[in-house]
Amino acid sequence: MVSNLPSILVPMVGIVLPAIVMALLFVYIETDEIA
C-alpha cells in the first residue's frame, strides 16, 4: 500500500498545487484591481 502512495500523491500534487496557486493569483489580481 505504501508503494502505491507516490503514484497517487504525485498526480494530486500536480493538480492541486497549481489549482491553489491559480486561485491565490486570481484573488490577488482581483483585490489589486478593486483596491
UniProtKB/Swiss-Prot annotation:
Coiled-coil regions, chain positions: none
UniProt xrefs under InterPro entries: PSI_PsaI (IPR001302), PSI_PsaI_sf (IPR036357)
Keyword Thylakoid: yes
UniProt keyword Thylakoid present: yes
GO BP term, example: photosynthesis
GO CC, alphabetical: cyanelle thylakoid membrane; photosystem I
SUPFAM superfamilies hit by this protein: Subunit VIII of photosystem I reaction centre, PsaI (SSF81540)
The family this protein is said to belong to: Belongs to the PsaI family.
Designated name of the protein: Photosystem I reaction center subunit VIII
